[in-house]
C-alpha cells in the first residue's frame, strides 16, 4: 500500500512501471493533485516511463567521452577573468575557466579561498549578535586595534590602543584595561619580550639596545593575531533572503572550515567553503564529492552555461573521489595512474612513461579507448564491443 490517497487500480497501474520509487512518488503526487481517473493515470505513468527509459544510458555508451564533450565545449566560452564580483561587496572570488581548472586539478588551496557562513537562529536575525561571530572569525591584528610608534631614544615600541575598537572587538568584556592586559600577555608569549602596561598603553623593547632589533619587533608585531582565525583576513556581513526568511550571512576572505564550525553561533549544517580538501578533511569524501559538483555547477552557471546536465559533472566527481580520496584529473592523478601504458604516455611526458614501462616489463592489454585508437584497433565501446557469430547452434 502506498501512502498516497489513490485507488487500488491507479496504484496497480503506477506500480507496474519500471520507474524508481522517487519518480513513482512524483507520479502519485501529480495524480492526486489533478484528480485524474484510471485511464489518465495509466497514460501519465506510461508517458513518464517512456521518458525515463529514453534517458537511461544504453549499454556500451561512452559516457566518459560524452561528459568530456559536454563540459569541454561550454568551457571554450568561459571567460579568463580570475576575479569576479560575486554579488558580495568587496569579496573577490576566482570564477570562469581558472576556477574550473582549479576544481578538476583538485588544487590543495584555491587562489581566492572563501567561506559562506550561515548563523544559528538567535544570531542570524540580530546584527549585534552576528557581529559577535564576525569578531570571533576575522583575524584581529595590532593595526586594527590602535597606533604603533617607535621611541628610538629609549629603544621602545609603543602601542596606543583605541578603547572604542577594543570594546567593539571584545563585546562581552567591559573593561578595556583587562583587554589590554590580555593583548600584552599575547605579545610577551609570541615575541619573548617583557611589556609594561598602563591603561591602554603598552610598551616593550629588545633585550639589547639595537635599532635593527627594534624594527624587527615591529614587523613581527604586525603579524600577531590577537583574536579570530589567522587564515581569515576579512569578513563581510550581509542581509539576505533565505528559505528561513531574511537573515544575516557572513562571507570570508580566506578559509579554515574546521575552526569556523567550532565557533558558537555558526550553523554547521549550512556553512560551506570553496576549498574541497578542507571539506574532505572535516566531513569526508561524500561531502567533498557533493561540494565538487555544486562548485562546478555554480562556476558554469556564473558564466551563463547552466544548460550542462549535472550528471556529466557527477560522473567527473565520482571518478575524482572513487578511491576514497580526492584525485586530480591530470598526470599526477587519474590520467597518470591508468593501467594502460599507452594511455599514460598519450597524456603527458610520453618518453618517461614508455621508458618506465619497458624497464618494468609492463604489458598493455588494450582495454581502453586511447590505446586502441593509437594502435588502430576498434575501441571496445558501442558496436566495437559487439561480436557476431555466424552459423552457431544453440544447445
Curated annotation (Swiss-Prot):
Keyword annotations from UniProtKB, A to Z: Cytoplasm, DNA-binding, DNA-directed RNA polymerase, Nucleotidyltransferase, Transcription, Transferase
GO biological process, one term: DNA-templated transcription
Family matches, as Gene3D superfamilies: 1.10.150.390
GO terms of molecular function: DNA binding; DNA-directed RNA polymerase activity
Enzyme class of the recorded protein, top EC level: transferase
Keyword Transferase assigned: yes
GO CC list: cytoplasm; DNA-directed RNA polymerase complex
EC number(s) given by UniProt: 2.7.7.6
Keyword Cytoplasm included in the entry's annotation: yes
Catalytic reactions of this protein: RNA(n) + a ribonucleoside 5'-triphosphate = RNA(n+1) + diphosphate
UniProt record similarity statement: Belongs to the RNA polymerase beta' chain family.
Record note on quaternary structure: Part of the RNA polymerase complex.
Function of the protein: DNA-dependent RNA polymerase (RNAP) catalyzes the transcription of DNA into RNA using the four ribonucleoside triphosphates as substrates. Forms part of the jaw domain.
Listed name of the protein: DNA-directed RNA polymerase subunit Rpo1C
Species in which this protein is naturally found: Haloarcula marismortui (strain ATCC 43049 / DSM 3752 / JCM 8966 / VKM B-1809) (Halobacterium marismortui)
